[in-house]
Structures are given as C-alpha cells and as structure tokens.
Amino acid sequence: MMHLRRSVSAATDGPESNPRARTAFVLSCGGNQGVVQIGQLRALIERGIVPDVVIGCSAGALNGAALCYAPNLTGLDRLGAVWADLRTNDVFPGGKISRTWNVLRKSTHLFPNEGLAGVIERATPARSFADLAVPLRVVTADLDSGEEVVFCRGPLAPALLASAALPGVFPVIHHGGRRLVDGGVVDSVPLWHALSGPVDRVFVLNVSHTASDRPIRTPLDVVMASFAHSRNMRYELDRRLASEHVEIVELPRPEDQREIFDFGGGVELMEAAHHLCGDALDAYLDGDVLSTSEDHRAGRRLRIRFARRPVLRSSSAAPAA
C-alpha cells in the first residue's frame, strides 16, 4: 500500500506549525530507479518545499547536484529530460562485449565510467560545489576501511563519479590516498548526515532497491536481495534514532519491476511518482491523517497514513570534516 510515512518526536507539532522550518532533502541510491526522484522532487518544489541542504548518494547525488544548481521546475525539466533519454548503453557502454573483455583481462570493473561522466555533464552545468545555489553533501564509501567519506567542496564530477562507482561494475575513484566507491555500499539512504547541521525536518526520497522489488531469478538477484536486507536495516535504525531530533517525512514511490540494466519507461515512472507524491504531500500539508501510532518516548515510530490514497498505474574535491 502506497502512503507517506511521517516520523516525529512526541514534542513535534504539525506541518504548518513552523512555516520557516529548516528543511533537508535526503536522496537515496537506486540506480535506474533514480528517475523516480524527479517526480518526487517536482511534487515538493510545486508546493513551495525547497531544501536548505541536500544529501545524496549514487543516483541521488546526481539528482541532488542538479537540484542544488537550479532548485526550481526549470532545473527539474532539464534533469528529467536527461533521465528520459537515458539508455542502457549510455550508462553501461559496450554491453556484453565490454563485460566479457574486462573479465578476460582480469579487470577490477566491468564497465568504464565515461558513460557516467557524460550523464553528469548533461545533468548539470555545475563544475564545482561552489557553483551550487543550495549546499550539497555527496556520500561515498572508502573501499578499504568501509568508512563514509562525504564531499561538500571542490570539483563536483569526481565526487559524483565516486558516489556512483558500484564496486565491480565501475572503476574505483582514487582520492587523497583512498579508494572510493558507491556510497550506497554502506549507507543507501544517508539520513544521519542531515543532522550535522541545523535542520527541523527531513524529506526522504528513498528509491533504493528492496528485497521484494523483483522476483529472484538469477544469482545476481540473490546477491542484490541479501544486500538490500542489510542496507534497509541500517536505514531503519537511523530513521528511528533521527526521528528523536527532527521530523522525518518519507515520500512514497510507484512500483518499479524493471531489471537493473533497464532504463526504459522513465517518463511514465516520473509521472507516476509526481502524482503519487503530490496527493500524499497535499494530505500532509492539510493534516489529513488516518491513524497515528504510539509516540517515540516508548521507542516506537510515529506513522501517519493519509486518507487520500491515489491509485496508480505504473507502467579536487575535499571530503567534509
């Protein structure tokens, strides 16, 4: 069932109680499902909900960079056009030939990252974090230590390439003596980083793969499902802890049964997400709630389900201190 989930502490008032609330957007990883975030962002911006800071990893970092450069509908139109035109070969150039060749020569990755670099260049004119109108934090992971490494200044492209460098699929990014890879490896929904500054509410755009996203058909499906369980447990823990400090609003998303290499159907998914989140946000802003659970003082989450449930047919960079 699609709904908007809102987690707050016992002392938090309703959404209209603080019209100048300091707002963070957290954009998860998600690969080809990153297209859903465009519809989610459009629903937010149309309702005057603009971020004071954005935190993203992998596909969410790319979308976050474009949003932070132009936090308006025009900027989202540009980003949406990039996603709508994306094809598998744009991101994974060479296809099976490239994969086979890299396996035979014992490469550490299956695909070069030139395709990703081209997508980044088309998605935003920004070349540096200094070009952004809204502060952005890009989450990556240190392959050797497992530490999260967060970028917030310097050249933008290396940070985005590192954040999307899925281990074994794309080459690692070497920076400052570290080998950096996709931030989703350790933190698929980098919620906790939103609390490093003065923030009152956090909108979470979580489009990361879950274990139930698609049937288990191949060995890769088994690996992805197991990986998803581990990452989701991290997010649930972070969400429970963070909701003691800020209001957390998790946006719904449409169902997406595409394979991970399939970039078709982007326009339909953007439209479905826009409609779904628009209805949920209207209900959130109106305070139109259906039910409320126990408060957080008992260590439980507060969940609000909204009465209006839409029916959808989904067809040199320096790390932050």
Regions found by a protein language model. Give the residues of each.
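Patatin-like phospholipase
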Residues: 1-57, 65-321
